[in-house]
């Protein structure tokens, strides 16, 4: 993955992708406002947004980092930097 992914929320505006969560879902965070995290399920007619707690979002990101490390993904460093910027 070389490009950042963004999605527009109808109320909170621009969100950026924090980590894939599996099964057609991704974790996104608000870009400009107070940090809020969403589990976004991509559907044929749009997206479903579910607000999730900070620790759940962090857990999804940690699981994804572990998977990248285990698989030797070339994108691990990029995801690690995003994790640091978002959660630390």
Predicted regions and their residues:
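Long, non-catalytic architectural segments outside compact domain cores
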Residues: 1-55
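Short, compact, well-ordered microdomains
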Residues: 54-88
């Amino acid at each position: 993955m070389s490009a950042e992914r963004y999605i527009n929320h109808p109320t909170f505006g621009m969100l950026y992708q924090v980590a894939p969560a599996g099964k057609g879902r991704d974790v996104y965070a608000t870009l400009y406002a107070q940090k809020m995290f969403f589990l976004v399920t991509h559907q044929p007619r749009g997206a479903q947004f579910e607000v999730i707690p900070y620790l759940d979002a962090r857990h999804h990101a940690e699981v994804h980092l572990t998977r990248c490390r285990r698989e030797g993904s070339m994108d691990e460093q990029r995801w690690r930097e995003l994790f640091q910027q978002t959660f630390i």
